[in-house]
Amino acid sequence: TLPFPLPEGQVELGSYSGGYGSKGSYATGEVIGTNRVRFTSSKPLAPNEGLTIVVSWPKGLVAEPGMGQKLRWFLADNGAALVLLLGLLIVFTWYYLAWDRVGRDPQKGVIFPRYRPPHRLSPAACRYVLSMSFNKDAFTAAIISLAVKGQVEIEEEDKEFTLQRKPGEPLALLSPGEQAVLNTLLPLDSSRIEMDNKNHERFQSARKALTKALKKEYRGRLFKLNGLYVLGPIVVSIAAAVIAAFFQGGPAVWISYLVLVLLLHLLYAFLMRAPTPAGRVVMDEIEGFKMYLGTAEQDRLDRMRSPQMTPELFESFLPYAYALGVENTWCNRFAREMPREVRDQSGYHPAWYHGHLHGMGALHHLGDNFSSSFSSAIASASSPPGSSSGGGGGGFSGGGGGGGGGGGW
């Protein structure tokens, strides 16, 4: 039954019957009355067979919907996608404008070799400021700095490490972060601790104490995270998802939105971090110092007129080399430039490290294997124990695409 009368002699009937995709038919159709048609099959339909009917009439018999109706249909079918797309555009625009305002880094200065670290910056602070974030390398550098400064002895046996506090050593040369690590990890003069995850709570507390001290000293003064600028886009992205939930939207729409919006948040959370003008100057100094520590070629060192290598100079800068990732080059340079009197006295013997290697073997070990094994031990010690749609038109059986005279406005 159709909702309007059919013009006599201007109606065409057709049908397709059989299995999916069949072009044949064993059904006939006829017009009954002014608005009814009937189709009769000459034999029963077998399992998995279907009947598709086709009724067509002259164009203009049914009024074509206006633009308003088409727009309403379009919004009903694609409302969720449009709302989410608008949300993404707002989030991106917000982030870009915020980044353009506060997230652009000041222009980097000229980087040239510097023979001293920036004034009053500890190794952990150099790592923290240069990366504008805290990571395990800063914690590793802080412990090695405590050892080099005579506060801690590092004992290694079969890649197992133990830290022993040395009593009576002055604390004046320690940075606030290093003091926080020492007081948390080894609070008493004779404290001793194995770098094992059974002691993870103390290592985690020491790591948090170092992070807190570094944040207090340098965040906001040398660099800014500009985290408040991220809150608005997060609210917009959540609001867009809530509004879109009232419209139709398939899984592909939601998955695409979640992936894109998360990428935007992560990208701009990183890009919004920016050094202050004073911080950019300090970063340039750190990079210049790293250039000096990481230079291996002798001719370049000669042109740089670098200071004469001594055991004292080597040890004082070794924690910085660990912090900046150039410890191998720094240790190899000392092995090559080691003063003759040190070689004649059976090589280098660090007072703060006790392991199975001595002399030149210990020196090469500090550069090659110690960094990775010690960092892995710290990471381990800081962690708790193991802890669809239907067939479209096209005129075949089961397709359902011929009925209603498709397209005949």
Task: Indicate residue ranges for each PLM-predicted region.
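Hydrophobic membrane-spanning alpha-helices of multi-pass integral membrane proteins
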Residues: 229-245, 256-265, 290
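Short, amphipathic alpha-helical interface elements at domain boundaries
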Residues: 23-25, 60-232, 269-315
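Short hydrophobic helical membrane-anchoring segments positioned at the boundary
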Residues: 200-205, 209-219, 237-238, 263-409
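A generic structural signal for beta-strand entry/edge sites
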Residues: 34-38, 158-162, 321
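Extended beta-strand-rich architecture
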Residues: 65-73, 239, 253-263, 352-353, ...
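Intrinsically disordered, low-complexity linkers and stems that provide flexible hinges
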Residues: 1-74, 86-89
